[in-house]
């Protein structure tokens, strides 16, 4: 990290290799479009490279990087909000006797899409990216208590939404 900050391009390429998949997956879960996620990932790493010297605490690199990703994703989402409002109205899940793993993944994705943007992002950062509440608070620029509230409320909603699926899977 320090070598990258000092302008070592090879060291930065190593950082990109280490983080690109996580950043891409995070963006994909937020913007829900593979091409946009790829474009945003490139923008994130370009902005990170350009701003790396301003990073004061190298130990906070991951939170700093995901803050850039957050900003880029929500900038895009604000631009295209009118066209996504209709897409967010997902039809209810069809009943099934038993769900296959792919169907379960789709059900979880659909349930995540029903959460508010704030809740979805907090859950993604906590459950999929493994950040601590304090790190998420830094990324989202809000109090830790707000992050906890968003995560726990979202998990309750997900549990409620996915409970019928779990029941069907036990049959």
Features from the language model and the residues they span:
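Pre-recognition alpha-helix immediately N-terminal to the DNA-recognition helix
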Residues: 10, 107-110, 120-121
């Amino acid at each position: 990290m320090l070598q990258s900050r000092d302008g070592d391009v090879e060291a930065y390429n190593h950082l990109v290799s280490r983080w690109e998949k996580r950043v891409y997956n995070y963006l994909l879960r937020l913007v829900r479009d593979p091409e946009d996620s790829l474009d945003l990932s490139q923008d994130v790493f370009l902005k990170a490279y350009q701003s790396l010297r301003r990073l004061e605490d190298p130990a906070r690199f991951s939170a700093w990087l995901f803050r850039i990703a957050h900003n880029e994703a929500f900038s895009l989402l604000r631009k295209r909000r009118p066209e996504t409002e209709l897409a967010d109205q997902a039809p209810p899940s069809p009943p099934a006797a038993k769900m296959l793993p792919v169907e379960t993944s789709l059900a979880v994705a659909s349930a995540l899409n029903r959460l508010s943007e704030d809740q979805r992002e907090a859950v993604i950062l906590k459950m999929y990216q493994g950040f601590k509440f304090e790190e998420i608070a830094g990324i989202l620029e809000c109090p830790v208590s707000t992050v906890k509230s968003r995560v726990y409320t979202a998990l309750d909603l997900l549990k409620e939404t996915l409970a019928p699926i779990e029941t069907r899977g036990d049959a």
